[in-house]
Amino acid sequence: MFQNNPLLSQLKQQLHDSKPHVEGVVKGTDKAYGFLETDKETFFIAPPAMKKVMHGDKIKATIETIGDKKQADPEELIEPMLTRFIAKVRFNKDKKLQVLADHPNINQPIGAAQTKAVKEELHEGDWVVATLKTHPLRDDRFFYAQIVEFICRAEDEFAPWWVTLARHQQSRYPVQGQDSYKMLDPQTRKDLTALHFVTIDSESTQDMDDALYIEPLEQNGEQTGWKLTVAIADPTAYIAADSQIEKDARQRCFTNYLPGFNIPMLPRELSDELCSLMENETRAALVCRLQTDLQGELQGKPEFLLADVQSKAKLAYNRVSDYLEQAEGAWQPENETTKQQIHWLHRFALTRINWRKTHGLLFKEKPDYSFVLADNGHVQEIKAEYRRIANQIVEESMIVANICCAHYLADNAKTGIFNTHAGFDKKFLPNAHHFLMTNLSNAQNQDELTVRYSVENLATLEGYCRMRHDIEPIDGDYLEFRLRRFLTFAEFKSELAPHFGLGLTGYATWTSPIRKYSDMVNHRLIKACIAEQACLKPSDDILTRLQEARKQNRMVERDIADWLYCRYLADKVENKPEFQAEVQDCMRGGLRVQLLENGASVFVPASTIHPNKEEIQVNSDELAFYINGERRYKIGDIVNIQLTEVKEETRSLIGNLVL
């Protein structure tokens, strides 16, 4: 009687339309139920309704009121959480193929089938790439996925690398090379093979892209300054601008340096052989000659030229540092000329460090953490490595060469790829001013600092550098860590602009063309200037891709490191080891800290810090953790923690504070 009744259908539609409708994001739990988080409110999703959605789905829902509680009924999919995703293979009790998405908040198995492109026979636990083909809210069917790519077997020790590269859609292989290479540059090269160039790198480095030669400038028998010659490997001498190698390098943008090995931007026969500035081998190079006075101030204009060079000594960072620091039993230079070069470069670097400390900005010393791996990929140890004097020699030489490049390109090419940083994000300038005044001003200096740290002054390179110099002597990292959250991102631009982070009016890298595509572009522009040819402005597409690739590479490195930390600490957690750690973030849910010994990131849940969550407050302006109105922890604080749990499936470490 009521079947196909138009009045009943109309009544149902009216009832439906009268209910509140919301848009939000599904938040899964480790139970069968979930929640819908909207801009203003969070709604309960009952277990039957959760079967139609997945954590992270953006959906439309109607709100039902049952008793005194509101709950969401999912109706329409706006954007699925999963499209292309990484998964592990599993088989249900009926031996039907399924996949489990590799995501900490998604635990429901998804029915799957493999495409014809995947030839491997799949086993439980294998890693694959899948795409979601059907969704209950969109297709009126169950969740269903297709396996489109095989990554590696479950037992593959290098799964952290292969899975992470697949997640970020990066190749595990070098760029495909050519059968042979020939010199493409028509210009004559200056023969500088007689100069005693040296390279300083890690002992294992094969892709050596910079060599240095230095001599003092003298007048009437007295030293007046330094003349530094920087020779940089010249891959564009062998790579045509329209070649496939160039196109592949433009897509990759950077050599990917991963724990244990690297994936080069260029074919290995170029990066590690033909272009590498190997000891006693003549190599094509792009060379910059620059001069400074004894205070490290650049004098005159730099000279760029094409040359043939020959490194006379392959030196290693640690050996040179041990030698200069006069460590017991330290390595000694093989001859007097190399010894002289090391000492002159050392003096030059100290001069430039002092110049940058006064006229630019220096970064605070923080260690790099390196994984020492066995051949099978097991982590043997994790070393905290500080930049020693030999690293600083190379760093200062490269920085001054990159400063020269920026102004050379701006003057001659009128374009280039410039590394820029605009300091504080404009929208956070008032916050930065308020924070500085709150933490540094008092009755005596308030008027002075109001002007010194005004929004207008902080927006200028000079004012920003002055502020950084002011806070540098203050103990601890709190001020720097908090101010860092107000900064904008570094950008690649095609016009000269300041780099606030370095405190410089211009900066353009050209010293790593084997490893960075932006440096290859700048090489071509420098060569065009030398040959007095037209210079083409780098396209916005190249700048955008550089930005994307830099972000991707950092995420790849971080994701692999998180996984390796879990593997390394998994067999140690049962002993509840204690570590010193630095607070990196304060959140309502707890503290994020970094272990000083090895760099691992550990989460400390708020529930382990204080039992009553109602008495916990987080001050988002200060990035500080309060208990009963008293500030207990803030970013930059050093705390002691005990490692309590390692979750390799989610690549997370959990700890407690040791009070």
From Swiss-Prot:
Lineage: Bacteria, Pseudomonadati, Pseudomonadota, Gammaproteobacteria, Pasteurellales
Listed HAMAP family: RNase_II
Principal localisation: cytoplasm
This protein's name: Exoribonuclease 2
UniProt entry keywords in alphabetical sequence: Cytoplasm, Exonuclease, Hydrolase, Nuclease, RNA-binding
All copies of domain S1 motif, residue ranges: 576-658
Source organism: Actinobacillus succinogenes (strain ATCC 55618 / DSM 22257 / CCUG 43843 / 130Z)
A molecular function (GO) term: RNA binding
Family label: Belongs to the RNR ribonuclease family. RNase II subfamily.
SUPFAM superfamilies according to UniProt: Nucleic acid-binding proteins
